[in-house]
Amino acid sequence: MNRLDFVDKPSLRDDIPAFNPGDTINVHVKVIEGAKERLQVFKGVVIRRQGGGIRETFTVRKESYGVGVERTFPVHSPNIDHIEVVTRGDVRRAKLYYLRELRGKKAKIKEKR
């Protein structure tokens, strides 16, 4: 075992479901406003997963009022309350950057059967 793996192991989360690029997910993020804390849901398509171990991140893209919004989250972040997989997508790429250029029905991802 690597020294860094030994240090990182206590911070790794085991409650994260398996998801891949192309999947539509709900990310429940803890938002702190002053003294209050609330959950905010960010629903979108996973366009990439990157890195490994404690440094692993994923990027979720959604359309909000006609504007594309992307947000990158660390997988093992304590600010993520939980993640729900809504649908499984059927894609042939690991990085779905081409979705940035597509609009409307063309940006739709087929669902896995």
Curated annotation (Swiss-Prot):
Originating species: Mycobacterium tuberculosis (strain ATCC 25177 / H37Ra)
Keyword Ribonucleoprotein: yes
Sorted UniProt keywords: Ribonucleoprotein, Ribosomal protein
Pfam families, A to Z: Ribosomal_L19
SUPFAM superfamilies for the chain: Translation proteins SH3-like domain
Protein name: Large ribosomal subunit protein bL19
GO molecular function, one term: structural constituent of ribosome
PROSITE patterns to which the protein is assigned, alphabetical: RIBOSOMAL_L19 (PS01015)
GO BP term (any one): translation
Family stated for the protein in its record: Belongs to the bacterial ribosomal protein bL19 family.
Domain of life assignment: Bacteria
Function: This protein is located at the 30S-50S ribosomal subunit interface and may play a role in the structure and function of the aminoacyl-tRNA binding site.
Gene3D superfamilies recorded: 2.30.30.790
NCBIfam families: rplS_bact
GO CC terms: cytosolic large ribosomal subunit
